[in-house]
UniProtKB/Swiss-Prot annotation:
Gene Ontology terms, MF aspect: ferrochelatase activity; metal ion binding
This protein's GO CC annotations: cytoplasm
Species, as recorded: Cupriavidus necator (strain ATCC 17699 / DSM 428 / KCTC 22496 / NCIMB 10442 / H16 / Stanier 337)
Binding residues annotated for Fe cation, in chain numbering: 218, 299
Protein name: Ferrochelatase
HAMAP family in alphabetical order: Ferrochelatase
Function: Catalyzes the ferrous insertion into protoporphyrin IX.
SUPFAM superfamilies: Chelatase
Single GO BP term: heme biosynthetic process
Record keywords: Cytoplasm, Heme biosynthesis, Iron, Lyase, Metal-binding, Porphyrin biosynthesis
Length: 371
């Protein structure tokens, strides 16, 4: 195996610490070609689709990609941002805003770290961002996936890709991984404040008359739970902690699972049928919040805010409220900083004094170092 060449080592160089935020990914454009390229990478991951490759890949390339690329492109087109200050895929826009906000907050607290974001599928790729961090002299990297609840289909595959990339390096950085933060007090507090702020602006549901808060998480095949994936349990715990923080009784909120793909049984109850059933029984108001998505994306903006609202109202529901995700809200940025700092303990968060760096370089040169 040939390992990649390294930048020339500089004595007296101040090693930097980096925080790498990783999210799922997005197509480069809302076009069938770009969406097809993204879906091919995403659905080819054996962590995502646990079907024997010999059976799955012909189906993926021969049926699924030709059919889904155009349909999905229309959905991306419906949510694509085209404002002067926000242009592109919502997931990428909000992910970059999160990284910039976290960078500002760390700087304000005197922590000299580099914050970057990458996507597991699509761009900016984990490989390209890790390479950029290497060239900036980052020798410690904290990988913080934007998946509060751990799953082999999300968190693990992000770690897999980091390991794959670093496996090609000759001089690897020191690495730390954040597995999950589904019950972290700062995360729960940020969720609580996000819902509370929305209710302060738009009024609270009338729970006494039967209004309901739906907490919709991304679904995964039920088989993953049976094989030991903790995702289902962590979603339920997040939902319970958020419900308690909001002062709600168990019947006033419900955890559901969305984005089912294929015919296999997934985690239940499913979000769409739940919304339709609430509409049928005449629910006056339903609020939907997606705690497992720290940034708004196609699953929240199109599947919930558009399709979910239609499901509810066509079935007879009246008042539908979609509560935006955390995005770059201040409480969430502060929570990210708190989570990161807990995992950064013991790593350098400040640059040594220039005199100390020069002394290191001089000592190395007296021993024959070239630079």
């Amino acid at each position: 195996m040939t390992f990649s060449p390294e930048p020339a080592y500089q004595h007296g160089h101040a090693p930097r610490t980096a925080i790498l935020l990783v999210n799922l990914g997005t197509p480069d454009a809302p076009t069938p070609k770009a969406v097809g390229r993204y879906l091919k990478e995403f659905l080819s991951d054996p962590r995502v689709v646990e079907i024997p490759r010999a059976a799955w890949l012909p189906l993926l390339h021969g049926v699924i990609l030709p059919l889904r690329s155009r349909a999905s492109a229309l959905k991306y087109e419906s949510i694509w941002l085209r404002e002067a200050h926000m242009t592109g895929s919502p997931l990428l826009v909000y992910s970059e805003r999160q990284a910039h906000a976290l960078q500002r907050l760390m700087n304000q607290h005197g922590h000299e770290v580099t914050v970057a974001c990458a996507m597991r599928y699509g761009n900016p790729s984990i490989a390209s961002v890790l390479e950029a961090l290497r060239r900036q002299g980052c020798e410690q990297v904290l990988v913080l996936p934007m998946y509060p609840q751990y799953s082999g289909t999300t968190t693990a595959t992000a770690f897999d890709e980091v390991f794959r990339v670093l496996g090609q390096w000759r001089n690897q950085p020191e690495l730390r991984l954040v597995k999950h933060f589904h019950d972290h007090p700062a995360y729960i507090s940020a969720l609580h404040q996000q819902v509370g702020a929305y209710w302060a602006r738009h009024g609270m549901p009338d729970f006494a008359r039967g209004d309901k808060l739906i907490l919709s998480f991304h679904g995964v095949p039920r088989r993953t739970l049976e094989l030991g994936d903790p995702y289902h349990c962590e979603c339920l715990k997040t939902g319970r902690l958020l419900g308690e923080a909001l002062g709600l009784q168990p019947g006033q909120y419900q955890v559901t699972f969305q984005s089912r793909f294929g015919k296999a049984e997934w985690l239940q109850p499913y979000t769409a049928p739940t919304l339709a059933e609430l509409g049928k029984v005449g629910a006056g108001r339903v609020d939907v919040f997606c705690p497992g998505f720290p940034a708004d994306c196609i699953e929240t903006l199109e599947e919930i805010a558009m399709e979910g609202q239609t499901e509810f109202k066509v079935a007879g529901g009246k008042d539908f409220h979609f509560i935006p995700c955390l995005n770059d809200a201040d409480p969430w940025v502060a929570a990210m900083a708190e989570i990161a700092l807990q995992h950064l303990q013991g790593w350098p968060l400040a640059t040594p004094h220039p005199h100390e760096l020069e002394a290191r370089r001089t000592r190395a040169q007296t021993r024959g170092a070239a630079a």
